[in-house]
Amino acid sequence: MNLKLQLKILSFLQFCLWGSWLTTLGSYMFVTLKFDGASIGAVYSSLGIAAVFMPALLGIVADKWLSAKWVYAICHTIGAITLFMAAQVTTPEAMFLVILINSFAYMPTLGLINTISYYRLQNAGMDIVTDFPPIRIWGTIGFIMAMWVVSLSGFELSHMQLYIGAALSAILVLFTLTLPHIPVAKQQANQSWTTLLGLDAFALFKNKRMAIFFIFSMLLGAELQITNMFGNTFLHSFDKDPMFASSFIVQHASIIMSISQISETLFILTIPFFLSRYGIKNVMMISIVAWILRFALFAYGDPTPFGTVLLVLSMIVYGCAFDFFNISGSVFVEKEVSPAIRASAQGMFLMMTNGFGCILGGIVSGKVVEMYTQNGITDWQTVWLIFAGYSVVLAFAFMAMFKYKHVRVPTGTQTVSH
């Protein structure tokens, strides 16, 4: 099989299995299993708990002892088993435990798939910068397609979404076994555990600007978790109104939500221009403003014609909110730190956004939703306005505290890291 096609299938399956349940599990737990907001928040925070340390730990295993191919296959085997078990779970405590174990297995694969892809491309004499992005985009396509399949199959509120995820995980394991062997690098054999775990990057907190940047990374990472947890659940809440129960938005909430991912792929293309023209601080400010709009538009959106326009606009600005912080933030880290700790600093950035930010967003937003839910009815407008208010506070705090003087460079020389 052609190398690029092989890696495209790998990326497609990696994110297709995640897309089958990540944005709809909250709806299934809230509507079908009747979990409260705090319980749902706890389940989703498990992704953050796993993201704090598991990628680094299994990255070390793949670097020093066991081929990345086999670590990757073992992780997805565990993932298939736990998703199969999750489909049969009906209590918050059991769901938290099963999804936590699943997260321990899945989160490291986000880095391992890059390791596998980079090695194969470099071994074939290809350029990662030019050849990898067109491969990675198939991951986003897979995520979107899974959302559509689950929605059109009527499984958004069903445990069947988890069976689909388990089946896709099993298929991915079998496909991984067909890949060529990837040798253990052993390049880090003489490094200390402190260096291997990326703990050297904690020294960056001595730099005031970097410390502020990482703290805001966590606070903004929390906003992404809010969307993953409750966006789909919110759209399904309109089925309690007879006027909206049969509307396309309620019946196929995942398809509407997938506009967010489509927008994300388009906004990536604008990052080089905005970074070179306006600088990291202004680009990140645009991201925070986009989060304000994301939540405010949700607050006033509904399945009416005008409300639908507001909901679609909310999905579109999500692409800006996500990319202008996550991608631009990665570029900022790349340019600000010394080459010696660049990889550790990138790991720190991911730890703050996908780890601690995920935990914070899961716990706090779950409590907010629980607080404004009475007799199974959630006051979503108030909930979204609270999150929008949180974003407004972040915007003013970021503007006042983060100091950065931009030196404009030609667009063509701006490097964007994916």
Swiss-Prot record:
Keyword entries, A-Z: Cell inner membrane, Cell membrane, Membrane, Symport, Transmembrane, Transmembrane helix, Transport
Gene induction: Transcriptionally regulated by CytR and DeoR.
Location (main, coarse): membrane
UniProt activity-regulation remark: Inhibited by the protonophore uncouplers 2,4-dinitrophenol and carbonyl cyanide m-chlorophenylhydrazone (CCCP), and by valinomycin. Inhibited by the nucleoside antibiotic showdomycin.
Parts of the chain that traverse the membrane: 5-29, 37-58, 68-88, 92-113, 136-156, 159-178, 210-236, 248-268, 281-300, 306-326, 347-369, 380-403
Effect annotated for changing N228A: Abolishes the binding affinity for uridine
UniProt cross-references to InterPro entries, sorted A to Z: MFS_dom, MFS_trans_sf, Nuc_H_symport, NupG
GO biological process: adenosine transport; nucleoside transmembrane transport; purine nucleoside transmembrane transport; pyrimidine nucleoside transport; uridine transmembrane transport
Alphabetical list of Gene3D superfamilies matching this protein: MFS general substrate transporter like domains (1.20.1250.20)
Pfam families: Nuc_H_symport (PF03825)
Cytoplasmic-side segments: 1-4, 59-67, 114-135, 179-209, 269-280, 327-346, 404-418
PROSITE patterns linked to this entry: MFS
Membrane association type: Multi-pass membrane protein
Sequence similarity: Belongs to the major facilitator superfamily. Nucleoside:H(+) symporter (NHS) (TC 2.A.1.10) family.
Cited HAMAP family: NupG (MF_02049)
Additional note from the record: Binding of nucleosides to NupG requires the presence of hydroxyl groups at each of the C-3' and C-5' positions of ribose.
Protein name, entry field: Nucleoside permease NupG
Gene (name only): nupG
